[in-house]
């Protein structure tokens, strides 16, 4: 594999299409027609890939229960890159999802060395206030990992299903990696699976919107979901007859659970010591649902592997990668409106060197950080955005006018957002927030 995905470094991906082949991510455009009222990021191909999003789209269409889950490490200022994730959480919540947001203070403690108090301050002042200001509803759950007992308990159980060799293969961990860092990874997997615990309604589809650098967490969690489950359903083929059938297998399953399954599965079935062969039940999804129901009744886990969406990274305002450690490369949601506008005006564009060349050759919006701000955040109308793009390419729109428009819109957004942050502060006690004791 040529592409390295690291959740704790600033990844630079130049060819997103490689991720389809190397990591098994599917193109998002294939599932787009199934989504009612798709989000702006979906329509504009900012979200480029997914895993198992079909089940989320189906839940939206049918009104079935589903969840959106995401988290933020409280390690610095909340910026436009974080806003992208928050926008997707809020949209899924509006589409009917129960929403879960974890403040990854265990990760910040182990990876960044931050104190618990600092994690709490950053978590509230930066991330939680902005999340609420962007439209997060009070019926969602916000929690600090260190204060959430269900996450900590589940993380401990998950830790029994993964070893150092697996973590090394997925994350590149070495003998220098601290134990708390490895524990924070198990905690992230627990974050993702928590919405399917019985206290939150049991098994259901869960989507995690991420940048591709976070995919290692999804791969680990999907594998752990299967290892934790009481049963697994497999499609098999009789080596003698070539006939296909389904098999429900569970080495650690209670015999009573297997017997109950045998009673409920219609058609011809064969019960063995540790599995059931289902010979006349072609509906795989229906069988999986039945297996989950019986599993929960007998106190076992029946996790559905989490779905995920993958969005493009924002480039830095001066070109290259956006980095929290380089203030001029990004706009924080707590920057003053005037400072935000100034950063836009100083940003790198995709225009030509001279005005004459620009009129003759046109600009390159795909290389312009100012157009990217409009694409990701500032222009709500697809028609208006397309008009700006066409005028840029044709040479009838100059970089100065684009910067002025984007700067004005950024200033308006930051002013409005920061007013909403102060309102959010006044209403914090109306939200379900679990803090560290």
Swiss-Prot record:
SUPFAM superfamilies: Nucleotidylyl transferase. Its EC number is 6.1.1.2. It catalyses: tRNA(Trp) + L-tryptophan + ATP = L-tryptophyl-tRNA(Trp) + AMP + diphosphate + H(+). A motif ('KMSKS' region) lies at residues 321-325. It holds the Pfam family tRNA-synt_1b. CDD domains: TrpRS_core. This is Tryptophan--tRNA ligase. One of its GO terms (molecular function) is ATP binding.
């Amino acid at each position: 594999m040529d592409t390295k995905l690291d959740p704790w470094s600033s990844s630079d991906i130049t060819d997103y299409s490689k991720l389809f082949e190397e990591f098994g991510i599917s193109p998002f455009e294939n599932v787009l027609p199934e989504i009612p009222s798709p989000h702006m990021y979906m329509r504009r191909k900012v979200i480029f890939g997914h895993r198992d999003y079909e089940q989320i789209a189906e839940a939206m269409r049918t009104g079935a229960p589903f969840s959106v889950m995401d988290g933020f490490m409280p390690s610095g200022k909340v910026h436009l890159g974080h806003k992208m994730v928050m926008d997707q959480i809020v949209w899924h919540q509006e589409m009917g999802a129960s929403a879960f947001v974890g403040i990854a203070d265990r990760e910040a403690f182990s990876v960044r060395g931050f104190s618990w108090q600092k994690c709490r301050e950053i978590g509230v002042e930066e991330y939680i206030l902005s999340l609420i200001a962007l439209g997060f509803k009070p019926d969602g759950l916000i929690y600090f990992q260190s204060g959430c007992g269900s996450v900590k308990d589940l993380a401990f159980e998950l830790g029994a299903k993964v070893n150092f060799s697996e973590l090394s293969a997925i994350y590149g961990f070495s003998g220098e990696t601290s134990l708390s860092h490895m524990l924070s990874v198990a905690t992230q997997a627990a974050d993702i699976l928590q919405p399917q615990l019985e206290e939150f309604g049991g098994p259901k589809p869960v989507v995690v919107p991420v940048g591709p650098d976070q995919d290692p967490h999804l791969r680990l969690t999907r594998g752990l979901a299967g290892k934790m489950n009481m049963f697994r359903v497999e499609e098999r083929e009789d080596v003698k007859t070539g006939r296909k059938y389904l098999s429900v297998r569970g080495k650690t399953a209670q015999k009573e659970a297997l017997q109950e399954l045998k009673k409920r599965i219609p058609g011809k079935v064969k019960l063995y010591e540790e599995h059931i062969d289902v010979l006349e039940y072609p509906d795989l999804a229906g069988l999986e649902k039945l297996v989950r129901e019986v599993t929960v009744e007998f106190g076992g886990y029946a996790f559905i592997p989490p779905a995920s969406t993958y969005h493009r990274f924002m480039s830095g305002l001066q070109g290259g990668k956006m980095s929290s450690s380089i203030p001029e490369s990004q706009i924080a949601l707590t920057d003053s409106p005037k400072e935000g506008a100034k950063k836009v005006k100083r940003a790198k564009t995709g225009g030509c060197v001279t005005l004459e060349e620009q009129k003759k050759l046109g600009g390159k919006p795909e290389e312009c950080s100012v157009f990217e701000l409009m694409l990701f955040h500032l222009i709500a109308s697809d028609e208006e955005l397309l008009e700006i793009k066409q005028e840029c390419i044709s040479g009838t729109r100059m970089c100065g006018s684009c910067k002025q428009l984007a700067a004005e819109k950024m200033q308006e957004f930051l002013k409005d957002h920061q007013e909403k942050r102060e309102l959010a502060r006044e209403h914090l006690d109306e939200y379900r927030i679990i803090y560290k004791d």
